[in-house]
Amino acid sequence: MATIEGTFEKSSSLKVAIVIARFNDLITNKLLSGCLDCLSRHGIDVSESSNQIDVAWVPGSFELPIISQELARTGKYEVLITLGAVIRGDTPHFDVVVSEASKGIATVSRETGVPIIFGVLTTDTMQQALERAGIKNNLGWSYALQALEMGSLMKAVT
């Protein structure tokens, strides 16, 4: 029996795109910082002049799938990370945005064969979102680790 796993080693050559929602940017900027910190610590050049990473801003989480699709189709990236923050309000808008964003991102990943990390926080309150994007527990770091592992795993199976 073969065991196939992704690793975090030899990830310094990985080409990554991050698609990030501007809505709730107090949160998404923190997620981006955590993400970039993790990638940098694993050898990926995250400087402004880097040819390893690109960051695309979209208005909100609902728009993440379409830009992810276009970036994945370029063939330039080995993995994408989507970042967003959807906080429950008094209307059903939350449910619609979360449902469509998650389904859309999953569909794009399956159809293009490019792993896309779903880094969209879905919380009931702003406080919950801040806790998940904070200094002690920044999920942006975790999303970047998932991207490194999936990039490595895809290389191992293809």
UniProtKB/Swiss-Prot annotation:
It comes from the Bacteria. It is an enzyme of class 2 (transferase). InterPro entries: LS (IPR034964), LS/RS (IPR002180), LS/RS_sf (IPR036467). It catalyses: (2S)-2-hydroxy-3-oxobutyl phosphate + 5-amino-6-(D-ribitylamino)uracil = 6,7-dimethyl-8-(1-D-ribityl)lumazine + phosphate + 2 H2O + H(+). GO terms for biological process: riboflavin biosynthetic process. Its EC number is 2.5.1.78. Gene3D superfamilies: Lumazine/riboflavin synthase (3.40.50.960). GO terms for cellular component: cytosol; riboflavin synthase complex. It holds the Pfam family DMRL_synthase. Pathway: Cofactor biosynthesis; riboflavin biosynthesis; riboflavin from 2-hydroxy-3-oxobutyl phosphate and 5-amino-6-(D-ribitylamino)uracil: step 1/2. 5-amino-6-(D-ribitylamino)uracil binds at F23, S61, F62, E63, A85, V86, I87, F118. (2S)-2-hydroxy-3-oxobutyl phosphate binds at D90, T91, R132. One of its GO terms (molecular function) is 6,7-dimethyl-8-ribityllumazine synthase activity. Keywords: Riboflavin biosynthesis, Transferase. The active site is at H93 (proton donor). Catalyzes the formation of 6,7-dimethyl-8-ribityllumazine by condensation of 5-amino-6-(D-ribitylamino)uracil with 3,4-dihydroxy-2-butanone 4-phosphate. This is the penultimate step in the biosynthesis of riboflavin. HAMAP family: Lumazine_synth. Belongs to the DMRL synthase family. NCBIfam families: lumazine-synth. This is 6,7-dimethyl-8-ribityllumazine synthase. It comes from Prochlorococcus marinus (strain NATL1A). The lineage of its organism: Bacteria, Bacillati, Cyanobacteriota, Cyanophyceae, Synechococcales. The gene is ribH.
